[in-house]
UniProtKB/Swiss-Prot annotation:
Pathway(s) annotated for this protein in UniProt: Amino-acid biosynthesis; L-arginine biosynthesis; N(2)-acetyl-L-ornithine from L-glutamate: step 2/4
Protein name: Acetylglutamate kinase
Main location class: cytoplasm
Single biological process term from Gene Ontology: arginine biosynthetic process via ornithine
Membership in a protein family: Belongs to the acetylglutamate kinase family. ArgB subfamily.
Organism: Bordetella parapertussis (strain 12822 / ATCC BAA-587 / NCTC 13253)
Pfam families listed in its UniProt record: AA_kinase (PF00696)
GO cellular component assignments: cytoplasm
HAMAP family noted in UniProt: ArgB
InterPro entries with a match to the protein in the record: AceGlu_kinase-like_sf (IPR036393), AcgluKinase_fam (IPR004662), ArgB (IPR037528), Asp/Glu/Uridylate_kinase (IPR001048), Glu/AcGlu_kinase (IPR001057), NAGK-C (IPR041727)
Role noted for this protein: Catalyzes the ATP-dependent phosphorylation of N-acetyl-L-glutamate.
Length: 300
């Protein structure tokens, strides 16, 4: 199978010049600002999308923005579990994580996936550095207990899954000041050193809050948030989100994504978007063009 060409590579010089001209006011506006990107979905597994993501992140850094990448790795974890004869289980979009699964999560996210992303960014001219929650005490966590919808008095034990208690941003800010691009694996650590698997959407949202990010972009495998008829919802308010939760329009893996996005919007992140990671250069389209892509989340 031949690799699909990057659409940017076939644009005429005039169109490229127009795109650059359109980007200029956004580059000015966001210069020096932090942009947190949750990297996941097809953009992590398709080669052409991996390349466009890496180029986008490096370009954003070169023009004066401060991208911070928080990555997922669900398919890679599932593959590793299958190789040892285990099947992944989810409750309300959160992976149930026993001790053996936690070992796999640490190895896959903090090792294989993180290093692949770091190398990919560095190969196209960036300076990326990988972090887990243990580095600089970045992500401190406690064991998460899920609400049992059938019996709220009996919470569900989902294993080594964590709730964030504190994010210590000093190490991220130090890397940004030295022109590095932080790449963060969603693994937190308890006071006793216990490792916890934390949903990457939750980590991205909290990281955006603590860093005072200008924007939070959540990459997904859909055009954005869709209604029950499959139509893209361009913007969502807090009230609309509550209604979509209640009627089941937002469910499964989209639940933590939207909840974390709304929390970030409520806690000072100026702009929160769910973007289609299957679109090449979706980060540049969302940040540096008039059009944008996906769904905007508002706290109002």
């Amino acid at each position: 199978m031949t690799d699909t060409p990057d659409p940017a590579a076939v644009l005429s010089p005039a169109v490229k010049a127009a795109v650059l001209s359109e980007a200029l006011p956004y580059i000015r506006r966001f210069h020096g600002k932090t942009i947190v990107v949750k990297y996941g979905g097809n953009a992590m597994t398709e080669e052409r999308l991996q390349r466009s993501f890496a180029h986008d992140v490096v370009l954003l850094k070169l023009v004066g923005l401060n991208p911070v990448v928080v990555h997922g790795g669900g398919p890679q974890i599932d593959d590793a579990l299958r190789r040892i004869g285990k099947q992944g289980t989810f409750v309300q979009g959160i992976r149930v994580t026993d001790a053996e699964t936690m070992e796999v999560v640490e190895w896959v996210l903090g090792g294989q996936v993180q290093q692949d992303i770091v190398m990919m960014i560095n190969e196209v001219g960036g300076k990326a550095v990988g972090l887990t929650g243990k580095d600089g005490m970045l992500i401190q966590a406690t064991k998460k207990l899920m609400v049992n919808k059938d019996d709220p008095s009996q919470p569900l034990d989902i294993g080594f899954v964590g709730d964030i208690t504190r994010v210590e941003p000093a190490v991220v800010k130090a890397l940004q000041d030295d022109q590095f691009i932080p790449v963060i694996s969603p693994i937190g650590y308890g006071e006793d050193g216990t490792a916890y698997n934390i949903n990457a959407d939750v980590v991205a949202g909290k990281m955006a809050e603590v860093l005072g990010a200008e924007k939070l972009l959540m990459m997904t495998n859909t055009p954005g948030v869709l209604d029950k008829g499959g139509k893209l919802l361009r913007s969502l308010s807090a009230q609309t989100i509550d209604e979509l939760f209640a009627d089941g329009t937002i469910s499964g893996g989209m639940l933590p994504k939207i909840s974390s996005s709304l929390d970030a919007a409520k806690n000072g992140v100026n702009s929160v978007h769910i973007v289609d990671g299957r679109v090449p250069h979706c980060l540049l389209l969302e940040i540096l063009t008039d059009q944008g892509v996906g769904t905007m989340i508002s706290s109002h």
